[in-house]
Amino acid sequence: LRRAPGGGSDGGHEEGRITYNPGLAAEALLMQSAKAAGVPEPEVFYVLAPDDGLGEGFIMSWLQGEALGARIVRSPELAEIRPKLAYQCGQILARIHAIDLHATGLDQCLHTLTPADYVHTTWDRYKAFKTPQPMIDYAGRWLLDHLPVGLEMALVHNDFRNGNLMISPNGVVAVLDWEVAHIGDPMRDLG
């Protein structure tokens, strides 16, 4: 069972934040869409409805694996799969970025964040500190003057990293924590 803390709503946007949480119903749809595209995910059995009286959430299958990065890099049980994980992650990201946003309905429940959105929001936050740093000023202005244009937007997990991947001796068994996924530049998942 995946629920919001306190059983309430987990979606929304906090003023001044760059990322948006699409909510648990959207997270369930993300996992279902990713699984249908060949991304390893738990099976989502049921998305809670308001009539259920249990708050927002969903029920999914239990998967066996390890998500703690320190254990993944040291566990003798995972020694054989470790050299193959980078390749598996590349395959998984390619599948995520190729998901048809319109056909899955994700375009209706996810926010779009462009590189320009990130640069402008970060620049505005920096300026609010009113402590000029010449190199940051130079870099910020350069980024503002060289924003990418004409990018093809895709589904972005936005937190694809050790700790959000469940690993077993067979490889990646699940991509976890979709709460900051959005539509944007897929390069966000590579940095």
Feature-to-residue mapping (PLM):
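Active-site Asp-x-Gly
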Residues: 154-155, 161, 166-191
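ATP-binding pocket architecture of kinase catalytic cores
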Residues: 1-155
